Regions:
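Active-site neighborhood of phospho(di)ester-bond hydrolases with catalytic His/Asp-centered motifs
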Residues: 53-57, 82-91, 111-112, 201-206, ...
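Structured loop/turn residues at beta-strand edges in well-structured enzyme cores
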Residues: 80, 90, 131, 154-156, ...
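Long, hydrophobic, well-ordered secondary-structure blocks that form the structural core
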Residues: 101-137
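Cap/insert and terminal regions of metallo-dependent hydrolase folds
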Residues: 184-186, 195-199, 207-305
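Active-site metal-binding motif and surrounding structural segment of the metallo-beta-lactamase
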Residues: 49-111
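Glycine/Thr-rich phosphate-binding loops of Rossmann-like dinucleotide-binding domains
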Residues: 14, 62, 95-96, 233, ...
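Core dinuclear metal-dependent hydrolase active-site scaffold
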Residues: 1-69, 138-216, 303-309
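Residues at the starts of beta-strands that form the adenosine-phosphate
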Residues: 3, 50, 108, 134, ...
Length: 309
């Protein structure tokens, strides 16, 4: 049995963003606190005692406090049920939370070599001493089983695979430690319970849906998918930014080649959007965009949502 907890569903900066006065952020601060969301991450466990984080968001400390499943056991001076962290990219949204895990509890860190190279190139991540935090490279299309703290099997198999995307934005125009944008900068994950054979997919970033990706996702029990923007130019139209969704490596929810249309008809039992930007009108309950999303069988999960497979 797999247990999955949504720690956060928002894109960079969360909802509300600290300096934003857009309609969504204004409502989240005042009359609609249910709109508030921390930055995208999930936790998964096969035994309910040992958990693996998928990405470590900048809001991680707040997320851990809000999630009883991830609290330390009583009777220990230092303890954490977190056995490991799996990174799907090197964006700030995915790695900054690692700095909140520097108090000496051991855990495994799994990431593509290109992402590990980013961490090595920035000495601030040296606070994660390698005696306590072992770094394990992972490869696209090569399944692995993350280890429990005692070295035994976790019962979870993770298959990383490359998806269309881009490198971290803070490296734009700069030399990547291992070269320019390439496969490995953005990964999707298939996460499988070896006992039951149940599995789900996690894609917090994806620039487009390819035929290969459709084949992977078809028939899945659950898919978490990139929901950053409703339409490609919404940041520009709303005066919130200068980049399109595609320019940031993110597909739109709507439109002819958007996620909703591209993933329709694939017999996915449960579809959830994650990494949703504050500019996205689908966040507003009752909006036309939200109605279209829900009519197509999609959900936007609240922080703390738990799903069992």
């Amino acid at each position: 049995m797999l247990r999955v907890v949504v720690l956060g569903a928002a894109a960079g900066g969360g909802v509300p963003q600290w300096n934003c006065g857009c309609p969504v952020c204004r409502k989240a601060r005042s009359e609609n606190p249910e709109l508030r969301s921390t930055q995208a991450s999930i936790a998964v466990s096969a035994d309910g005692a040992h958990w693996y984080l998928i990405n470590a968001s900048p809001d991680l400390r707040q997320q851990l406090i809000a999630t009883p499943q991830l609290h330390p056991e009583s009777g220990h001076l230092r303890h954490s049920p977190i056995a490991g962290v799996i990174l799907t990219n090197g964006e700030i949204d995915a790695v900054a939370g690692l700095l909140s895990m520097r108090e000496g509890s051991p855990f495994m860190l799994y990431a593509h070599e290109r992402v590990l190279a980013i961490l090595r190139s920035n000495s601030i991540f040296n606070v994660l001493g390698e005696n306590n935090v072992k770094r394990q490279p992972i490869e696209a299309d090569k399944a692995f089983e993350p280890a429990l703290p005692d070295g035994s099997q976790s019962g979870i198999e993770i298959l990383p695979f490359a998806v269309p995307g881009k490198g971290a934005w803070y490296l734009e125009g700069k030399a990547h430690p291992t070269g320019g944008d390439a496969a490995g900068d953005t990964l999707g994950l298939r996460i499988l319970d070896k006992g039951s054979g149940k599995y789900f997919y996690f894609l917090a970033a994806c620039a487009r849906v390819t035929d290969d990706l459709k084949s992977r996702l078809a028939g899945a029990a659950l898919v978490f998918f990139d929901g950053t923007v409703w339409r490609d130019d919404e940041l520009i139209v709303q005066g919130l930014g200068t980049k399109t969704g595609q320019g940031m490596g993110h597909i739109s929810m709507s439109g002819e080649h958007g996620a909703i249309e591209s993933l329709a008809g694939l017999d996915i039992a449960r579809k959830m959007f994650l990494h949703i930007n504050n500019s996205n009108p689908a966040l507003l309950s009752g909006s036309d965009e939200r109605k279209q999303l829900e009519q197509a069988g999609w959900q936007i999960p609240a922080d703390g949502t738990e799903i069992t497979l």
